């Protein structure tokens, strides 16, 4: 087991997610790694991962997409989140530092804090698959955030040198900034290792692109429930918390576009066992080396699906090579010549980076649904819920955040439910069956008076809510 020293040279300095110092390019590319090289062998990061003993300090809700914010605002968001948890958690290293009052723009971006596991010693394992947070004593996982669910990472800022912060989505906290407190000097190693994992995962994607590039891998293994509860920009619903005993899927949310010819008639689906997910009760303090062996690994990705979705970082030099090899000649990127530093961790979706046109079936599906009275087109969650009055009322709407995704909204026992209808393979399905189309799914359940089973509860389709003409 290698020690986590940075070698004889200067440690990589990381400021606000931008790997700083002369060792890094200012072009936002991971191609030119530090002159001393990465801290760890690639096969270790691509395999079991690199583990660090740190303290989990909690998380702060992030109410806006990090991609909608400029780089400086993102950095301010993570700094403010660190300050908030330091003030709230006893014994935090940064608790005694005075901070300026939260500015009005930041107060509209940051929401509530979740300090459920604050101060807990954990083993952070960084790999190309995920950031895995496991209780250091009882070895239970408190969070497992897949790389494709992480939109920003920051560490090593002079004012918060002991902290690493990253923004990720999961079903429990929705989008939140998670804070890790590191032993002295370790934060820079942690953020560098995260950078190495992003680099390697993107290279895996370039070597093994899918036959049809669609943003469909927000989950590493399909367990039949990881995609069927909708998550949108609004943070007011945490569906997996609504059902006692329901185990949330691994971190990340499905973001899928339809694929031509993917749908099939009703067939039984293959399910995988659910894995420990975003929050579990855990234990007490433990001490040890900075690097420990990982006790529990996340399930490996499905074969042929080694790719990012949202967010993916743009490795400019590799993309240029890929375009040249493919005969493409996209327009030059203005940041390649250093005109503006690129945020290394908040990454554009791969389909944008590789300039892939949208999947053709999305349009035909939309056209087909226009003939259904219960289809309301693009509608927000709040607007859809306002149309439901009686138990059994339902409608179908197009997701406002994911093109090509359709959401079934219904009222059951006085509670609105929102179910995604398109799985990560582009198939219209429920947990138990596949369908030729959304219309087929609706008519099947209505005509046979069958409820849709999701997250341990039932949704009955009784009264379609017609759209207003």
UniProtKB/Swiss-Prot annotation:
A single GO BP: positive regulation of MAPK cascade
GO cellular-component term (any): Shc-EGFR complex
Reported modifications of this chain: Phosphorylated by activated epidermal growth factor receptor. Phosphorylated in response to KIT signaling. Tyrosine phosphorylated in response to FLT3 signaling and by ligand-activated ALK. Tyrosine phosphorylated by TEK/TIE2. Tyrosine phosphorylated by ligand-activated PDGFRB. May be tyrosine phosphorylated by activated PTK2/FAK1. Dephosphorylation by PTPN2 may regulate interaction with GRB2. Phosphorylated in response to FLT4 signaling. Tyrosine phosphorylated by activated PTK2B/PYK2.
Keywords attached to this entry: Acetylation, Angiogenesis, Cell junction, Cytoplasm, Growth regulation, Phosphoprotein, SH2 domain
UniProt cross-references to SMART domains, sorted A to Z: PTB, SH2
Molecular functions per Gene Ontology: ephrin receptor binding; epidermal growth factor binding; epidermal growth factor receptor binding; insulin receptor binding; insulin-like growth factor receptor binding; neurotrophin TRKA receptor binding; phosphoprotein binding; phosphotyrosine residue binding
Top-rank taxon: Eukaryota
Cell division listed as a keyword: no
Modified residues (Phosphotyrosine): 239-240, 313
Gene3D superfamilies: Pleckstrin-homology domain (PH domain)/Phosphotyrosine-binding domain (PTB), SH2 domain
Residues found modified as N6-acetyllysine: 44
Residue ranges constituting the SH2 domain according to the UniProt record: 374-465
UniProt xrefs under InterPro entries: CEP152/SHC-Transforming, PH-like_dom_sf, PID_Shc-like, PTB/PI_dom, SH2, SH2_dom_sf, SHC_SH2
Region entry CH1, spans: 230-373
SUPFAM superfamilies with a match to the protein in the record: PH domain-like (SSF50729), SH2 domain (SSF55550)
Compartments (UniProt record): Cytoplasm; Cell junction, Focal adhesion
Record carries keyword Phosphoprotein: yes
Phosphoserine modified-residue sites: 29, 339
PID domain location: 46-229
Region (Disordered): 1-26, 322-344
Its job: Signaling adapter that couples activated growth factor receptors to signaling pathways. Participates in a signaling cascade initiated by activated KIT and KITLG/SCF. Participates in signaling downstream of the angiopoietin receptor TEK/TIE2, and plays a role in the regulation of endothelial cell migration and sprouting angiogenesis.
Subunit structure: Interacts with CPNE3; this interaction may mediate the binding of CPNE3 with ERBB2. Interacts with the NPXY motif of tyrosine-phosphorylated IGF1R and INSR in vitro via the PID domain. Once activated, binds to GRB2. Interacts with tyrosine-phosphorylated CD3T and DDR2. Interacts with the N-terminal region of APS. Interacts with phosphorylated LRP1 and IRS4. Interacts with INPP5D/SHIP1 and INPPL1/SHIP2. Interacts with ALK, GAB2, GRB7 and KIT. Interacts with PTPN6/SHP (tyrosine phosphorylated). Identified in a complex containing FGFR4, NCAM1, CDH2, PLCG1, FRS2A, SRC, SHC1, GAP43 and CTTN.
Designated name of the protein: SHC-transforming protein 1
Lineage: Eukaryota, Metazoa, Chordata, Craniata, Vertebrata
Gene (name only): Shc1
